Amino acid sequence: MLGFISTVRSRLLACLTIAALSVGLNTVAQAQAVFKVTAIPDESPTELARKAVPLIKYLEKVLGVKVEYIPVSDYAASVEALVNQQVDLAWFGGFTFVQANIRSGGKVIPLVQREEDTKFQSIFITASADIKELKDLKGKTLSFGSPSSTSGHLMPRSFLLAAGINPDNDLKRIAFSGAHDATIAAVASGKVDAGALNISVWEKFVADKKVDTTKVRAFYTTPTYFDYNWTVHSAMPEARRKLLTDAFLALSPDTPEGKEILALQRATKFVPTKTENYKDIEAAAANAGLLK
């Protein structure tokens, strides 16, 4: 009788163990099934979250899994999140991609960029009547965006240097607003004499009448360069990388869904990109002493 009870007890424990393992494995599988997306915080958190909503829904449909948007506190956090595979897909600026590529030892892959990113530009703005060209910035105060921003810091700094202006020596003071919209606000409020930012954010503010162009105006637009992209870690299976790439390339303004996503992403369409496209940005960063 005791042997029978012992056998039953052993079988019951085995069943409970298997059940517990099954629950645990299911929990892990569910966690792994969540596809995580992040983006550099180049605009306000509420604006970034708003822009992400229809794209997240679209990716859920394409991938067949739950997709979550994961906000980050700064540009460096977005780099670390992808390099450490805490997220699956990241929206980077060109410089942020270069930083992630170096930080990961070449283990990140840019998939697509907006057509606009093949010929992106930065813009310098001011509310001062005394500033009409770059040389007029000498002795003035200037706001960049984030230190890791391509269009809000690296490339504006690079073009200033090319014009014979060293921001650290020739300007009265430089500031970092943290985001493009914050740069506009700093110029409009008179906190700084001028600001450098992403041209698409400036154009959106002008179109939406969020800035008084009778007071704040653009006075210099940079030459073009490659900028933003959607990037993944090389550990992502090739089949999933292709699925993501095809999903972005398939977005069209001819469908309601595509039109909404593209409008929020400020894109006419997405095109394939590659690491080699960002060599000039890497060189500019090295020349400006911004690569660590």
PLM features: residue spans?
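Short helices/loops that flank or line small-molecule/ion binding pockets
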Residues: 76-90, 103-104, 135-138, 179-200
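N-terminal secretory signal peptides that target proteins for export/translocation
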Residues: 1-9
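C-terminal segment of classical bacterial N-terminal signal peptides
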Residues: 13, 21-30
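Short coil/turn segments
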Residues: 42-45, 116, 126-131, 145-152
